[in-house]
Design a protein with these regions (language model features):
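Positively charged n-region of N-terminal signal peptides that target proteins for export
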Residues: 1-7
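Bacterial N-terminal signal peptides
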Residues: 7-16
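Aromatic-Pro/Gly-enriched surface loop or interdomain linker
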Residues: 18-77, 81-84, 182-183, 187-218
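Loop/turn elements at helix/coil->beta-strand transitions in domains of secreted/extracellular proteins
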Residues: 21-23, 73-77, 101-105, 129, ...
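An acidic, glycine-rich "communication" segment
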Residues: 24, 32-33, 39-42, 115-191, ...
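Short alpha-beta junction capping motif
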Residues: 25, 77-116
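Surface-exposed patches in mature extracellular/periplasmic domains of secreted proteins
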Residues: 57-65, 108-111, 129-137
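Alpha-helical scaffolding within the catalytic cores
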Residues: 60-67, 89-95, 159-163
Length: 218
């Protein structure tokens, strides 16, 4: 009887260990007054999609991390979005650079209006680098899901095409910047934006899954 009880306990421990998340995602909290907290349902939905379709093991709930925090190193992938001003202190610049050059990955999603604020701040992080547009044949567009034309357009604002830019440090893509796309909006709960279709939302989630798969395998 004692032996059976011991075996049962071991089995329960093994089963519970399978539910321990391997990874976590975080949204970046920054200073400057911009709405860093936007797209509230985006990451939880992306996490669920990746766990279901890529068989990843992300913690279901996303977390929040400040740019200058040591906690940033707990996440293989961090997400920054917003419409307005962004300011990185010198300590935050150093911390973010250390994170990115040490294996971390930053996805910046322009929620329309972020561009003029985020570019100068990222220039402080990598003064020696320029954002380069990733061509449609870049591997990030051809992971589990194929996007032969590159970054998909999710929301229309002013007729410009969607563009995916990258910062490449010593041959490794460390930051992916989605511009004129609103990818994160597409990850949000269906119905958040009345004009969105299920098709456009699925397209956004598939592109997000490609991004996560690329980050975890590059």
């Amino acid at each position: 009887m004692k032996a059976l009880s011991a075996i049962a306990i071991v089995c329960l421990l093994l089963l519970s260990s399978f539910n321990v998340p391997t990874y976590k995602m975080a949204k970046v909290k920054y200073n400057g007054g911009g709405d860093w907290y936007g797209d509230r349902t985006a990451l939880p939905n992306l996490i669920a999609f990746c766990n279901d379709n890529l068989k990843t093991n992300f913690q279901q709930q996303d977390e929040t991390v400040e740019v200058g925090s040591a906690e940033i190193f707990n996440y293989p992938f961090i997400f920054l979005t917003g419409h307005g001003n962004v300011i990185f202190s010198s300590q935050e610049v150093a911390n973010l650079r250390k994170y990115l050059t040490g294996g971390g990955f930053l996805h910046i999603d322009d929620n329309y209006g972020l561009d003029k604020f985020i570019r100068p701040q990222m220039k402080k992080v990598f003064p020696e680098l320029e954002f380069v547009e990733l061509p449609p044949n870049h591997p990030i567009y051809h992971q589990k899901y194929d996007f032969p034309n590159g970054l998909p357009k999710i929301h229309e604002h002013d007729g410009k095409r969607a563009q995916g830019f990258g910062l490449i440090y010593k041959g490794r893509l460390v930051c992916f910047y989605t511009y004129e796309c609103d990818l994160g909006n597409g990850w949000e709960d269906f119905g958040t934006y009345p004009n969105d279709t299920q098709e456009s939302r699925l397209k956004a989630l598939k592109m997000g899954a490609n991004l996560i798969q690329y980050v975890l395998t590059q």
